[in-house]
Amino acid sequence: MEQLIHYVWKHKLFPLTGLKTTDGQEVEVIDTGLHNHNAGPDFFNAKVKIGGTLWVGNVEIHDRASDWFLHRHDRDPNYNNVILHVAESIDVDVKTRRGDYPPQMRLQVPTAVREHYEELLTTDEYPACYRIIPSLSKLMVHSWMSALQTERLEQKTEAIAQRVKDCDGSWEAAYFVTLARNYGFGINGDAFETWAKLIPLQSVAHHRDNLMQIEAFFLGQAGLLDTAAIPERYQQQALNDSYFTELKSEYQYLAHKFGLQAMDANQWRFLRLRPQNFPHIRIAQLSHLYYEQRAGLSQLLECESVKQVRELLATQVTHYWETHYVFGEESAKSEKKLSAASLNLQIINTVAPILFAYGKHKNAEKYCERAFDFLETLKAEENHIVRMWKEVGLMVETAGDSQALIQLKKEYCDRKDCLRCRIGYEYLKGSSSIKG
C-alpha cells in the first residue's frame, strides 16, 4: 500500500541504519522532505547522503519500482530532479525524461507497523486505537485537541462562507440562516436552513414592530399556515381558531405584497420529536427573538461573555404558544423558553463559528479569540461521542474538548483516516522500535 510507505518514509518509521541503494551505496536519510499532496514528486527538498555525498532534491515513492513507468514519470520533466526513488519492491531500473537513472532504495514497511495498521483498519473495536489512549502524554493530547478544535471551526467557517455567498454577501442574513439551522437541533436542521433562506429580512424589517405580522411571515413561509399541513384531526379546530385564521389572513396579505413563495411543509419532521422541538415552537421563539431585535449579528458582536450571549439569545413565545404546540390542539400552559442546554448548543454551533468566521473575514483577531474563549467557558456536551471517548480514558471537560472529539470521530475514525491522526501516529510508532 503506497500510502503506508509514504507514511513510513515521512515519519521515519524504519531502521535508519544499514540502508543501501540497489547498487550497494550506503544511504543516510537526514531529512525526508516536505510531503507534496499535489502533482509532482512525493517529497520536496529532501536531504539524503548517498555514498557519502549529500544530495538535496525530490524523492518519489511507489509500491513497485515499475509504477514509475506506469505513472509515466519517465516522460514528465517534473521528475528530472528526483534524487532517490524509494519502493517496497524493486523490479526494474527507472529513467527520467532527461535520460538519468535515479538511485533506488528498497524500503520495507516494518512488519509490526503493517500489522498494527491493518488492525486499525479491520478491528470491530471503536475507537480502533483505544488500547494506547491511556498511555498518551497530556501534552500530546492537548496539542491534538487544540488542532482538532480549530479544524472544526475552520470547517464550519467554510459552510458559513457559502451561506454568505448564497445571501448575496450579507453577513446578517447568513447569521440568521445559521441561527435558524441550529434551531432545528439536528433533525430539522436542513428544513430550517431552507426556511431561513426564504425569509426576505429586508421585507420583514418593514413589519418588525408587529409581532403578529412577524409570526405570520415566519410561519407562513414555513408552510405551516397551509390547512393541509395541519393533521386532519385538528383541522376543524384550527379553522375555528381566531389566532390561526388571523395569521393565515395576514400571511396572504404579506405574500401578495412581497411576492412570497412558502416552502413545502412536508419537509418538516415530527416523528420521534419532542413537542418542545416542534417547528411551530422553534419558529415562534425565533419570531420573538427577531421582534425584540436580538437576532442580528451586530447585537451578537457586542457580546463579550457567555453570560451576555445567553441574555441576548434567551427567548420566549406569545401567549398563544404557551398553550399550544401545533395549531388546533390546546395543551397545558408552559413558558416554552429555550432551555439552558439548548442555549449552550446555540453558542457552540452558531455563535462560536460565526464569530470565528467573521473574525477571519474581517481580519479581526478579537472575534476569533472570543470564539475559542466561549467554547472553553462552556462545559462539554453530553452525547454518545463524548461518552465513548470518556470510556476509553480521555478527559473531556469543556465544549472545546467535545467539539474536538466530535471532529476526531467524524473526520478521522469514521473514515479510517488513521494516517492523518496524531493518535494513529502514536499507535503505529509504538508498534515499532523506531522513534520517528
PLM features per residue range, with description:
Residues E391-G436:
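Acidic, carboxylate-rich catalytic segments that either coordinate divalent cations
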Residues Y7-S66:
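N-terminal ordered "arm"
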Residues E118-E172:
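Extended, acidic-biased charged interface segments
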Residues Q149-A404, D417:
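Hydrophobic, aromatic-lined core segments that form the binding pocket/scaffold
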Residues T32-H37, N45-I50, D67-R75, I90-T96, ...:
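Catalytic micro-motifs at enzyme active sites that drive phosphoryl/nucleotidyl and oxygen chemistry
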Residues M1-Y7:
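N-terminal "leader" segments that precede or initiate the main folded domain
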Residues E60-K138:
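A surface-exposed, charged beta-strand/loop segment in the N-terminal or early-internal portion
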Residues A39, D76, C421:
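Short, structured segments at the rim of ligand-binding sites
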